[in-house]
Amino acid sequence: ENQTEEKTQYNLFDKGACVVSDNGVLKLINKDNQSLLSDELTIVSRVGDAVIVKQNGLYGMVNSKGQITVSPQYISLETMVPGKLYVYQVHGNNGMPAFGLVDGNGTIKTIPLYEEFRPYKTQDGILVKAYDSMGKQGLFNEEGEVVMQPLYQVTEPSKIKGLYNITDNLKKGVIGADYKVRVKPDYDDVRILVREDTFFVATSGLKSIVSKRVTQKIFETEGLILDIFKQSDGSICFVVEQDLFYGVCTSEGKWLIEPQYDEVLGIVAGKMCVRKG
């Protein structure tokens, strides 16, 4: 007796169409209570301003006007970025499942070359991690555009826009959005420090190397580099930890402050506040 009321309140689209449940069957109707789908299509779920449908065991997508945007042709169709991006599945050449990306308009964003996709949250939104059959990771944005090709075993955005942390054989490095390698993946750890200029601090064992580009090593020390700052004359200095003590060294390797302090409390205007004992 409340069926009409339920139909007008259940899963309403902005333009007046809505998904309703009629005896357990989902239907897409307009504001005049007319069905917008043919009987051959079964609604599986609503995604954004569309519905995922099934026909003869294959999945596709229909928008809120009843127009087929993704024809039913995929083994599965799953939401990756709601309302924007979806993962489709087909049979690969070897008979194994293969996955690609398609947007809500049915535009194929990537052919089915991948074994898996996962959303990856960042400060600027969602990136999509793509895993290929060679064990490499690529990155796509919310619209399905390529951010980074799958070149390394791990590829993740750094905190600096346009730079990406990479890992190969458990060794870390950095690559730019222009695909130029800033630090080869040869190190135990790599940090990016922005201090007027951008510095890359690579650590291997107890040795630290500072570079500005892949071929421009500006400092190397047996110790861990905590911070970098410039003196008033423009020369670059490094806060270094050696044997659990802290000091300051120039890029020429000269100690301005021998490593003798227990803690560095902060650096202000080129001056270091330290604690001893």
Spans of features found by a protein language model:
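Residue-level detector of conserved, function-critical positions
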Residues: E1-G277
